């Protein structure tokens, strides 16, 4: 008996076309174009999940540096002072304090400054 693969092909095509919903023009309607667009987008998504971590760390360091300089310390001296003081706050929390709780950040900066001298 002859096996017809229409159902499998239809499901495969449908899978890519569903993933390409919202794309413009043929990228959402033509199977081959949609497949290429989806595969490329998945590559970008994979890559950018890694890039996101780097970008956020960069942003946190930038914010901590700006706040530390307002308190008379460079970023590296501030972080070294925190290490000497035994403060184990991560960069994400420090950056959040620098933006939202300036007074608390100033106290932490004073602690770091006192441990440096």
Curated annotation (Swiss-Prot):
Q: What domain of life is recorded for the organism?
A: Bacteria
From its record, what is one biological process in GO terms? translation
Q: Its GO CC terms?
A: ribonucleoprotein complex; ribosome
Keywords on this record? Ribonucleoprotein, Ribosomal protein, RNA-binding, rRNA-binding
Q: Which InterPro entries does this UniProt record tie to the protein?
A: Ribosomal_bL20, RIBOSOMAL_L20_CS, Ribosomal_protein_bL20_C
Molecular function as annotated in GO? rRNA binding; structural constituent of ribosome
Return the NCBIfam families for the record: rplT_bact
Query: What does this protein's UniProt record list under function?
Result: Binds directly to 23S ribosomal RNA and is necessary for the in vitro assembly process of the 50S ribosomal subunit. It is not involved in the protein synthesizing functions of that subunit.
Listed PANTHER family = 39S RIBOSOMAL PROTEIN L20
Protein family: Belongs to the bacterial ribosomal protein bL20 family.
What protein does this entry describe? Large ribosomal subunit protein bL20
**Species annotation:** Nitratidesulfovibrio vulgaris (strain ATCC 29579 / DSM 644 / CCUG 34227 / NCIMB 8303 / VKM B-1760 / Hildenborough)
Name of the gene this protein is made from: rplT
